A protein has these predicted regions:
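An anion-binding catalytic pocket shared by soluble metabolic enzymes
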Residues: 1-3
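A short, conserved alpha-helix in the catalytic core of glycosyltransferases
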Residues: 5-8, 12-17, 23-51
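Glycine-centered small-residue hotspots that permit tight backbone geometry or close packing
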Residues: 17-18, 27-28, 74, 136-143
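Amphipathic alpha-helical segments in well-structured domains
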Residues: 30, 34, 68-73
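Non-heme di-metal
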Residues: 43, 71, 76-79
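Active-site donor/metal-binding and catalytic loop motifs
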Residues: 47-67, 78-79
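Non-catalytic, C-terminal membrane-associated alpha-helical segments of glycosyltransferases
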Residues: 70-71, 88-143
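Domain-length accessory/inserted modules outside core catalytic folds
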Residues: 76, 80, 84-94
């Protein structure tokens, strides 16, 4: 779910509850809440493709990657344990698969960082962000 810039009626939150306070650091609280809302109101989440949202942030790429690492490290497994039927939809199956290790590893990360210095392409940025999240999830299993 992409939950940014969502308008929710108070009555919906009264039925589903607020953010899960067991999520202890950055990330995932909106996804977890969206799952609960979708369970109670499966046909009521809609998106408007014409809506425009501009998000200004002064975070650097490294700060954002650190946030995504923390999300993977601290919160993602709690969400999967709470909602195991969303494991595949949230991409958890890929993290420990052969394909996941082939895609998200230190070689591909370093190559991506090198290429990012040459060309500022948004796919390189997205890869690094997702890779940081995957690293966090993998490290959470090791701790």
């Amino acid at each position: 779910f992409v939950f940014s810039n969502t308008i929710i009626r108070r009555s919906i939150l009264e039925k589903t509850g607020l953010f899960d306070e067991k999520l202890i650091s950055y990330g995932g609280e909106d996804t977890e809440l969206a799952i609960r809302i979708n369970r109670v109101f499966p046909k009521n989440l809609r998106k408007c493709m014409d809506a425009v949202s501009i998000h200004y942030s002064d975070k650097t790429l490294n700060q954002y990657r650190k946030n995504m690492f923390e999300y993977g490290l601290n919160n993602f497994n709690h969400i999967i344990e709470k909602h195991p039927d969303y494991k595949k939809k949230l991409g958890a199956n890929l993290i420990y698969s052969f394909k996941g290790y082939l895609i998200f590893n230190s070689i591909s990360r370093n190559l991506c960082l090198f290429l990012l210095n040459l060309i500022r392409h948004p796919l390189l940025v997205k890869f690094l962000v997702v890779s940081s999240f995957v690293q966090g999830v993998r490290n959470s299993k090791n701790s």
